[in-house]
């Protein structure tokens, strides 16, 4: 919720252009991604605010919208996992464990999986300003630092320090 309000207040002209471009095509993928993130933030807002009857009803209504957009976009992002500034560029399967913690300004591409190794195992903690490329799997209780770029199709099972770039061929390599 806070993302939507802050973004609108700071970038009114950009929002007008975005709505004009994104909503002009009825099957625009950016439209549904934006609607999914909006519904996610409203569900988070109503879960975290006071527990009045109206808030519960509004949360259920937004939860229904979130599930609808989840079926359209194939995103499974639980509430209160991602920080502000979440960016998703394309449709595709994005699955995040409810116990994971993702910092601010994270960019996700399709095929990202953030999970755990065992049913009772821990999930990842991801810092701020992290880019996660298409097809990347983050498995287990790993810690990914701030300002990290992870290339496509990587499998991350070990901690990554701040200000790193990770690329994958046969084995994961940290470049910086």
Locate predicted features.
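Left-handed beta-helix
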Residues: 79, 84-85, 89-92, 97-98, ...
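Conserved NTPase motor "head" modules and their coupling/switch loops across ABC/AAA+ ATPases, GTPases
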Residues: 74-78
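Terminal amphipathic alpha-helical/low-complexity segments used for targeting or macromolecular assembly
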Residues: 1-73
């Amino acid at each position: 919720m806070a993302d939507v309000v802050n973004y609108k207040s700071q970038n009114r002209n950009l929002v007008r252009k975005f709505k004009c471009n994104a909503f002009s095509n009825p099957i625009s993928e950016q439209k549904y991604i934006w609607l999914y993130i909006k519904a996610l933030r409203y569900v988070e807002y109503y879960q975290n605010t006071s527990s009045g009857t109206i808030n519960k009803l509004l949360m259920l209504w937004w939860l229904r919208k979130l599930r609808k957009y989840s079926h359209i976009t194939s995103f499974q992002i639980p509430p209160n996992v991602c920080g502000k500034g979440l960016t998703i560029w394309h449709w595709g399967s994005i699955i995040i464990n409810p116990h994971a913690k993702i910092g601010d300004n994270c960019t996700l591409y399709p095929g990202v999986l953030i999970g755990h190794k065992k049913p009772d195992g821990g999930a990842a903690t991801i810092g701020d300003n992290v880019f996660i490329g298409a097809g990347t799997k983050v498995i287990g209780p790993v810690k990914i630092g701030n300002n990290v770029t992870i290339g496509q199709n990587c499998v991350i099972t070990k901690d990554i320090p701040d200000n790193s770039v990770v690329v994958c061929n046969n084995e994961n390599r940290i470049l910086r």
